[in-house]
């Protein structure tokens, strides 16, 4: 009896995996923190590398059996440094959060202060306070001070930040780390405008490029390391179209502190198969990244304009809505972000609810925030352009503004998706973007 139940669970797992792939073949994926890897990246990720251990730095491993792993990891580091014009790269962090922790560990101690964007102003939970279960506070014990934020311009307020830093110094709360970047990231952050000032107070400047890494690689966003950031952290699977993982970049002087923080501090083995997938993605980004990043930004602007024309309140209007892959929409005229997210999912349109400026003061929380966040990274990699952005905006209008039954749109959404089943901006794309690979 137990054996048959075990086999039933076994079969159920594979059935659900296949159902998921089929669902995404017929959906419009607009999660800003996601992308679709190429078949080549998927091949690297399912390799035997995933079964091996390679603790430490390549050439200095704790384990034997790493001859080819070392070769690939050296190549991965070389490609990462070339892609971002950096002198040092640590490709071992297994996520963007772990990459951030490496910087916290290398350049601060528990009880120190970090300056970062608040979550309603676009900050990521890994930059957050302990009382909010933020990684910086909960795991590393940092005290967090927030940048003053200009809600109209949707970016950090430079003058008020300078004033705040001076006040923090008077109160003996001068930050050790200044963190730029975030999860709601419409426009470049003022790294160039603030870096000299922050460094005059001996702050280590880190730029969390998780969301915009592919745009930076393509030369279509800001260049944080050139503008004054000491280090740059990122995840590798958003606008940079690799597997899930992390990366830390910097100059030679950052090598030893970051290496020690990453291992043995924060990783043992580091998901070596994903490291190989990162290397493939870096090569793809060097070859195709400029064209991809340019199309992403064109699509985001077209999408934002189409949504605005449809009657939505799109944030950042005074600056042209967006300069990244993201669009933020205030949906309070129709419902809240949680309800809109759920309604759109019924139509196979996948978005996420989003806290926006003003939500916390108004008593709204993450489950029922005032906005939704949309991203065009994945649909751009599927080959969509301006006309498709307008059509998707129409679908969203029908569900959210016109209150049409989402399930009645399913056939239209599925028909719309039929022509977009291959990954673009890559060397090889014989396999369908969401094609299920059976190995049994």
UniProtKB/Swiss-Prot annotation:
Keywords: Amino-acid biosynthesis, Cytoplasm, One-carbon metabolism, Pyridoxal phosphate, Transferase. Homodimer. The modification N6-(pyridoxal phosphate)lysine is found at residue 238. One of its GO terms (molecular function) is pyridoxal phosphate binding. It is an enzyme of class 2 (transferase). (6S)-5,6,7,8-tetrahydrofolate binds at residues 123-125. InterPro entries: PyrdxlP-dep_Trfase (IPR015424), PyrdxlP-dep_Trfase_major (IPR015421), PyrdxlP-dep_Trfase_small (IPR015422), Ser_HO-MeTrfase (IPR001085), Ser_HO-MeTrfase-like (IPR049943), SHMT-like_dom (IPR039429). One of its GO terms (biological process) is tetrahydrofolate metabolic process. One of its GO terms (cellular component) is cytoplasm. Its main location: cytoplasm. Belongs to the SHMT family. It comes from Nitrosopumilus maritimus (strain SCM1). Pfam families: SHMT. Its cofactor is pyridoxal 5'-phosphate. Pathway: Amino-acid biosynthesis; glycine biosynthesis; glycine from L-serine: step 1/1. Disulfide bonds: none annotated. The record marks 237 as: Plays an important role in substrate specificity. The keyword Amino-acid biosynthesis applies. Its EC number is 2.1.2.-. It is found in: Cytoplasm. Catalyzes the reversible interconversion of serine and glycine with a modified folate serving as the one-carbon carrier. Also exhibits a pteridine-independent aldolase activity toward beta-hydroxyamino acids, producing glycine and aldehydes, via a retro-aldol mechanism. This is Serine hydroxymethyltransferase.
């Amino acid at each position: 009896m137990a054996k048959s139940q075990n086999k039933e669970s076994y079969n159920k797992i594979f059935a659900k995996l296949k159902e998921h792939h089929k669902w995404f073949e017929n959906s419009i994926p607009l999660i800003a923190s996601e992308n679709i890897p190429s078949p080549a990246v998927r091949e690297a990720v399912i390799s035997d590398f995933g079964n091996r251990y390679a603790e430490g730095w390549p050439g200095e491993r704790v384990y034997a059996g790493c001859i080819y792993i070392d070769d690939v990891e050296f190549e991965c580091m070389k490609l990462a440094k070339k892609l971002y014009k950096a002198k040092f790269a640590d490709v071992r962090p297994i996520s963007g959060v772990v990459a951030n922790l490496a910087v916290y560990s290398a350049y601060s101690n528990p009880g120190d202060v970090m300056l970062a964007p608040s979550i309603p102003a676009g900050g990521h939970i890994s930059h957050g306070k302990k009382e909010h279960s933020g990684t910086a506070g909960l795991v590393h014990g940092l005290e967090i001070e927030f940048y003053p934020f200009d809600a109209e311009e949707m970016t950090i307020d430079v003058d008020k930040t300078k004033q705040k830093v001076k006040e923090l110094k008077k109160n003996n709360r001068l930050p050790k780390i200044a963190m730029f970047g975030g999860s709601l990231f419409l426009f470049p952050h003022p790294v160039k405008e603030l870096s000299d000032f922050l460094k005059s107070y001996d702050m280590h400047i880190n730029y969390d490029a998780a969301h915009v890494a592919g745009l930076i690689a393509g030369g279509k966003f800001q260049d944080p390391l050139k503008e004054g950031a000491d280090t740059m952290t990122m995840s590798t699977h958003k606008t940079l179209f690799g597997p899930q993982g992390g990366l830390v970049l910097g100059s030679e002087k950052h090598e030893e502190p970051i290496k020690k923080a990453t291992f043995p501090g924060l990783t043992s083995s580091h998901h070596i198969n994903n490291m190989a997938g990162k290397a493939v993605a870096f090569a793809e980004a060097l070859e195709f990244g400029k064209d991809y990043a340019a199309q992403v930004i064109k699509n985001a602007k077209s999408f934002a304009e189409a949504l605005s024309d449809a009657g939505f309140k799109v944030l950042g209007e005074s600056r042209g809505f967006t300069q990244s892959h993201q669009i933020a929409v205030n949906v309070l005229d129709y419902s809240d972000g949680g309800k809109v997210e759920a309604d759109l999912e019924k139509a196979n349109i996948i978005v996420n609810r989003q806290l926006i400026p003003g939500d916390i003061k108004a008593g709204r929380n993450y489950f029922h925030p005032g906005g939704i966040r949309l991203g065009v990274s994945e649909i751009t990699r599927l080959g969509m352009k301006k006309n498709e952005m307008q059509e998707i905006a129409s679908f969203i209008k029908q569900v959210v503004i016109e209150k049409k039954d989402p399930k009645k749109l399913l056939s239209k959404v599925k028909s719309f998706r039929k022509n977009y089943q291959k990954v673009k901006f890559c060397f090889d794309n014989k396999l369908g973007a969401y094609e299920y690979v059976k190995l049994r």
